[in-house]
Curated annotation (Swiss-Prot):
Its main location: mitochondrion. Component of the mitochondrial ribosome large subunit (39S) which comprises a 16S rRNA and about 50 distinct proteins. This is Large ribosomal subunit protein mL39. GO terms for molecular function: nucleotide binding; structural constituent of ribosome. The gene is Mrpl39. The modification N6-acetyllysine is found at K123. The lineage of its organism: Eukaryota, Metazoa, Chordata, Craniata, Vertebrata. PANTHER family: LARGE RIBOSOMAL SUBUNIT PROTEIN ML39, MITOCHONDRIAL RIBOSOME PROTEIN L39/PROLYL-TRNA LIGASE FAMILY MEMBER. Residues 60-126 form the TGS domain. One of its GO terms (biological process) is mitochondrial translation. One of its GO terms (cellular component) is mitochondrial inner membrane. It is found in: Mitochondrion. Keywords: Acetylation, Mitochondrion, Ribonucleoprotein, Ribosomal protein. Belongs to the mitochondrion-specific ribosomal protein mL39 family.
Length: 336
């Protein structure tokens, strides 16, 4: 499938791995195609995941106490560093499995598929809770990561796409976003309605695949190796690593797309229902490296909107998310 953009063509990359190679840490990005970079990153991710699992060859039991409004006091005997909040939900009911978006583990927001590391208390969070703030933030964050995946894959291997960051923005801003730099040959390109529809279609393909959001905490050294070809991610990793003495960085993966994200994120892509890539804005047209802000809107399957309301929300989401809104969120996070 190809989409024309002026004299350029945007083509969805085909499935498949491509040739194998030897990893050379000093190789410039130009030597690896986007498909090869994806392979390399996943190889390193899988290797680190296997290494971490091998550190606990003997199964150790932990006790997890449920403190929710329903079924309070239920205690699960689970496997340390293997069992997840979703594993606990499976012992309760199908309702918990299908409705839970996040867990609170000893009061801390936690991914549903992130392994539990010690005996703890657990509570499950849903979109219908009296205060869904943490759930909404996780949903927005996850939708932005999906947007990054779509944009990175939408351009054929001939064009370099560098993901910069997914700014934390409040839901009330009306759109989530991902900042991106494109190949210099695309500096004059602005997306048509057909391009936006193509991006949206790719996002719905991710939703249809019902992919889990995997999470992996790694040493900054591992994260830097995975993202060695993206200077923006390298800077972001260094920033995050400097914020904790262990220099631990959180990675997430959907399918074969890996990103740096503090999380927590939603359990699966199928939590999303309505999703649209609605706008692209130029952030710094006077600077040498043009940064584009791709924006989108989504509602989960639990909170669907009628078409007329959805259309109004989409129209609102086209307005550029400003740096003031981004800074407002960052300042709020830093004071909590």
């Amino acid at each position: 499938m190809a989409t024309a953009v002026g004299r350029l063509v945007l083509r969805r990359p085909g499935a498949g791995g491509g040739a194998r190679w030897r990893f050379i840490a000093t190789s410039p990005a130009a030597e690896l195609s986007p498909t090869e970079l994806t392979e390399m990153r996943n190889d390193l991710f899988n290797r680190e995941k296997s290494r971490q699992l091998s550190l606990t060859p003997r199964t150790e039991k932990i006790e997890v106490k449920h403190v929710g409004k329903t079924d309070p006091g239920t205690v699960f005997v689970m496997n340390k560093n293997i069992s997840t909040p979703y594993s606990c939900a499976m012992h309760l009911s199908e309702w918990y499995c299908s409705k839970s978006i996040l867990a609170l583990v000893d009061g801390q927001p936690w991914d549903m598929y992130k392994p539990l590391t010690k005996s703890c208390e657990i509570k499950f969070l849903t979109f219908k809770d009296p205060d869904p703030k943490e759930v909404n933030k996780a949903y927005w964050r996850s939708c932005a990561m999906m947007l990054g995946c779509v944009i990175e894959r939408a351009f054929k291997d001939d064009y370099v796409v560098s993901l910069v960051r997914a700014p934390e923005v409040p839901v009330i801003a009306g759109a989530f976003c991902y900042d991106v730099t494109l190949d210099k040959r695309l500096d004059e390109w602005m997306p048509t309605k057909e391009n936006l529809r193509s991006f949206t279609k790719d996002a719905h393909a991710l939703i249809y695949r019902d992919l889990p959001f995997e999470t992996l905490d790694v040493d900054a050294r591992v994260a830097l190796e995975i993202f060695q070809h993206n200077k923006y991610k390298v800077d972001f990793i260094e920033e995050k690593a400097s914020q904790n003495p262990e220099r631990i960085v959180k990675l997430h993966r959907i399918g074969d797309f890996i990103d740096v994200s503090e999380g927590p994120l939603i359990p699966r892509t199928s939590v999303c229902f309505q999703y649209e890539v609605s706008a692209v804005h130029n952030l710094n047209p006077s600077q040498p490296n043009l940064i584009r802000r791709f924006q989108g809107l989504s509602l989960p399957t639990h909170l669907r909107a009628q078409f007329t309301i959805w259309d109004k929300l989409v129209e609102r989401s086209r307005k550029m998310v400003t740096e003031d809104e981004v800074r407002q969120t960052e300042n709020t996070e830093s004071t909590q």
